Amino acid sequence: MKVLLVNGSGHAKGCTYTALEEVAGALEKNGIETEIIQVGTQPIAGCIGCNACLKNGKCFREDGVNEFVEKAKTADGFVFGSPVHYASASGMITSFLDRAFYGKSALFQGKPGACIVSCRRGGASAAFDQLNKYFTINCMPVVSSQYWNQVHGNTPEEVKQDLEGMQTMRTLGNNMAWLLKCIEAGKAAGVDFPEREPAQKTNFIR
């Protein structure tokens, strides 16, 4: 089994990476393969609603989203990480997730998802709530921890001093590994993911 961890920070080895690395370490101790993907240093354009991804199976932009989507096909779980910018996730990870989930939402359904956020001081819970919405609109089991998945610090060294935050990351990794193994055991026992009904659309203005 494999989990993809996505770093949406502009600092490839900064605070967000430090938190993701702690999650990855816990997953690997439980026998889960991991890969940390850096996207925050790349210019990621937002979705323009052209629907090319729905027609052609991929976004017309070639900036890393399509490459991630290919890897997502064989991944079993996901952790998305972001620094906190104005009490929100970074613009880069937001654009990245908008396009990945809009174009290929079926790839993520039934697979566990989690997010982590990193901040110097405040705004973590608002950014955390924002990122979780990608999972809860897409039939993904959301993996939780002992607290909201956040770390505090202005440098990687300061993040490592956030003992509760780092423990929260390890607990998150352990919980995701447990859920992945439960899903695998369920499949082996003949328990499949619930079949979805045909989608119903409600517009408030007709």
Residue ranges and their predicted role:
Residues F60-Y147:
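Helix-loop-strand module that forms the ligand-binding subsite of alpha/beta enzymes
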Residues Q42-A72, A199-R206:
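Cysteine-cluster motifs in flexible loop/terminal segments that predominantly coordinate metals
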Residues V6-S9, V39, V117-R120:
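Cofactor-binding loop segments of dinucleotide-utilizing enzymes, especially the Rossmann-like FAD-
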Residues I32-Q42:
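A short beta-strand-loop structural module common to alpha/beta enzyme folds
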Residues N51-K55, N132, Q161-D162:
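Short, hinge-like loop/turn segments at secondary-structure boundaries
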Residues K2-N30:
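N-terminal beta1-alpha1 ligand-phosphate binding loop
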Residues P141-R206:
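Glycine-rich phosphate/pyrophosphate-binding loop and the adjoining helix
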